[in-house]
Amino acid sequence: MALVNEHFLKLPGSYLFSDIAKKVNTFKITHPKQDIIRLGIGDVPQPLPQACIEAMHKAVEELASKDTFRGYGPEQGYDFLRNAIVDYYKRNGVDCIEPDEVFVSDGAKSDTGNITDLFAQDNVILIPDPVYPVYVDTNIMNGRNITYIDANAENNFLPMPDHNFHADVIYICSPNNPT
């Protein structure tokens, strides 16, 4: 018989961004003439650049033909993309990255959530509060030992742990992490 992960029951009752969406919708109903600047999850401020649109069209055409169809890419990402990433950084003054050090993934959310899978179960995880919810939720689900440190106006939202405190993994969160 399959059993539920006991740590699942320790998660908050709802997801932060769902709660925010409900509050925004309620605000819009009660204040219909008020403008809202949305800075939340999944919102982008500008349309895609033309170069991205052209590359996506080309990729769709390649996927539509038996001669150019590729299926899943290499697990580390296509060489042309990894080389382009390295070239971008070199053009911008960062000349210490090699293509074999570049990992192309399905997105920051899953990677930042799963990174602690590389570490021992009993490591102490230090997480600022507030933080991007996936950092907390994935560590709770894995039964990790989490310690929180307050990020607030008094410390400029840049908390520093006490020098006597021990942590094995420390999440650093800025207002724009993980994007």
Tell what function each PLM region has.
Residues 3-7, 174-177:
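Short glycine/proline- and acidic residue-enriched helix-loop micro-motifs
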Residues 67-179:
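Conserved core of the PLP fold type I
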